[in-house]
């Protein structure tokens, strides 16, 4: 979309355009907007709070920013489908640019709908039923409940070290303090 003649990375209309495109892609893949997906899948009682990935996955803690990213809730098959859909749009953008065909962001919105329709995907024509603000608030509320559970289950390297029998700790410390030998 950066090739659109009316593209301005700092313009509010550009940010709104990206949100619309993101929601169209999500809707085509799983039938929900990004916000709807978060509200549907964020659940403090589920394993990993319903997330399938997060910044420190798979062994690190989930942190608050992780829970309001819709992509983090996608199943593997959905993630792969999303990737294919994004690639098809990028391939079209490259072809249009190579042929020097001027496009506006509105032109891109129409082309994306055409791509979705051609693939037999549902096309989102509105903003969905859940706002991004509500989804973020909901996910963060679920996270606060989940954090209590996670903190009980999670053991840090320090906790693991402290749970070692004393002889193992002594051996670990000896190993750490040994100078490295060079040949």
Indicate where each model-derived feature is located:
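Positively charged, phosphate-engaging catalytic surfaces used for nucleic-acid and nucleotide handling
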Residues: 1-173, 177, 181
């Amino acid at each position: 979309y950066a090739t659109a003649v009316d593209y301005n990375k700092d313009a509010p209309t550009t940010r709104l355009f990206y949100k619309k495109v993101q929601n169209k892609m999500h809707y085509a893949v799983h039938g929900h907007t990004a916000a709807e997906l978060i509200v549907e899948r964020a659940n403090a009682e589920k394993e990993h709070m319903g997330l399938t990935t997060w910044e420190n996955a798979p062994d690190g803690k989930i942190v608050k920013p992780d829970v309001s990213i819709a992509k983090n809730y996608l199943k593997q098959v959905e993630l792969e489908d999303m990737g294919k859909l994004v690639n098809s749009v990028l391939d079209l953008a490259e072809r249009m640019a190579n042929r020097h065909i001027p496009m506006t962001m509105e032109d891109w919105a129409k082309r994306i709908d055409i791509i979705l329709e051609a693939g037999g995907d549902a096309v989102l024509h509105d903003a969905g039923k859940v706002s991004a603000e509500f989804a973020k608030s909901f996910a963060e509320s679920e996270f606060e409940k989940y954090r209590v559970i996670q903190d009980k289950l999670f053991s840090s390297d320090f906790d693991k070290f402290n749970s070692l029998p004393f002889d193992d700790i002594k051996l670990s410390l000896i190993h750490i303090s040994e100078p490295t030998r060079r040949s």
